[in-house]
Amino acid sequence: MAKIVDIKGREVLDSRGNPTVEADVLLDNGIIGSACAPSGASTGSREALELRDGDKSRYMGKGVLKAVGNINGPIRDLLLGKDPSDQKALDRAMIELDGTENKAKLGANAILAVSLAAAKAAAQDQDLPLYAHIANLNGTPGQYSMPVPMMNIINGGEHADNNVDIQEFMVQPVGAKTFSDGLRMGTEIFHHLKAVLKARGLNTAVGDEGGFAPNLASNEDALGAIAEAVEKAGYKLGTDVTLALDCAASEFYEDGKYNLSGEGKSFDAEGFADYLKGLTERFPIISIEDGLDESDWAGWKILTDKIGEKVQLVGDDLFVTNTKILKEGIEKGIGNSILIKFNQIGSLTETLEAIQMAKAAGYTAVISHRSGETEDSTIADLAVGTAAGQIKTGSLCRSDRVSKYNQLLRIEEQLGAKAVYRGRAEFRG
């Protein structure tokens, strides 16, 4: 049995030029596992705490030397000599050492980086691909699937400096036969969308997640531009390709109203649910994330009752990858899907528990990046190793996004005939 002989933390940069945490876990046989913690822009209020230094003279207060110090000090001392393959024991030990509800003492960024680095070291020690090790940890050895990519090709909201209120407009290549075919389809649509926007005299600069970020007349205008790009790429909208939204509605919710400032419109919960329902009737939208504010559970129930039978309703800020909150949502019939983000909860073990709870209740689980990413591609292995069926990792440019797609291509090649891609069957309706 290999043992942990050293743990090192360091401050590195994420895709927005902000500091984040990287950890190395070293084993007594020379193996090293390394992992980086991502960081979000539109965040749920109940996410685990990302520990920042607050020193305004350094990185405008966003340094992570405190979190790094926690890795190099108390976390290292705690885990030296431990078995890296006992993921639950490692994660529970760090959670207990932290002792807070939201990992505020050590920092979710510190705990997560070590948690993932340990998993990578353990996978190497057992001569397993990371996705296979994750499947074993998940209690589903050998059960894999390639995820349908939800490609964010127009950015708005907190992810772009434009007038578009909805944060993400995505395409899903549900008609593809394989993941690699689906990735090609999405890439072709992305390039055709650039041409469509250019022809309209619109900006083709990209946002945080690599999608285009033009000023558009309305959210419906964004959907129309994508529909045109799909057609120009030679695909049939609604059959080959479907659409998805991430409203990130908490970002434009105030005093009980949903304010679409880009369109000069304001709605109550029922009105905004009807607005979204109307979009699903005019476009083949099969997934909507954070359609209402994270605290507006009554509004979420209205939306679920209106379109939940036909449309995947994903809780991101709503559930924050937290089993306690998810359990309550399941009991109340709120949404029908959970977005899975490692750093919302802060450990691999708790992430797997959230996926398992969702699946047991008939909810789908969508594996997701954050807007602040690195070259770390662990979420690709997580999607395959849990057979989640869906992944959100941005657009088809920026290496922080493409690194995940490229890792999925490698995994598909390794799995060969076992690389099952289910397409439309991964979604409701």
Curated annotation (Swiss-Prot):
Domain of life (superkingdom): Bacteria
Binding site for Mg(2+): 246, 289, 316
CDD domains in UniProt: enolase (cd03313)
Keyword Repressor: no
Chain residues that bind (2R)-2-phosphoglycerate: 167, 341, 370-371, 392
Summary of the function given for this chain in its UniProt record: Catalyzes the reversible conversion of 2-phosphoglycerate (2-PG) into phosphoenolpyruvate (PEP). It is essential for the degradation of carbohydrates via glycolysis.
Database matches in InterPro entries: Enolase, Enolase-like_C_sf, Enolase-like_N, Enolase_C, Enolase_CS, Enolase_N
Compartmental location: Cytoplasm; Secreted; Cell surface
The keyword Metal-binding is assigned to this record: yes
Pathway named in the protein's UniProt entry: Carbohydrate degradation; glycolysis; pyruvate from D-glyceraldehyde 3-phosphate: step 4/5
Major localization class: cytoplasm
Cofactor note (record): Binds a second Mg(2+) ion via substrate during catalysis.
Alphabetized SUPFAM superfamilies for the sequence: Enolase C-terminal domain-like (SSF51604), Enolase N-terminal domain-like (SSF54826)
Source organism per UniProt: Pseudomonas putida (strain W619)
Keyword terms of this UniProt record: Cytoplasm, Glycolysis, Lyase, Magnesium, Metal-binding, Secreted
Record-given protein name: Enolase
Catalytic residues, chain numbering: 209 (proton donor), 341 (proton acceptor)
Membership in a protein family: Belongs to the enolase family.
Complex formation: Component of the RNA degradosome, a multiprotein complex involved in RNA processing and mRNA degradation.
Name of one Pfam family that matches: Enolase_N
Any one GO molecular function term: phosphopyruvate hydratase activity
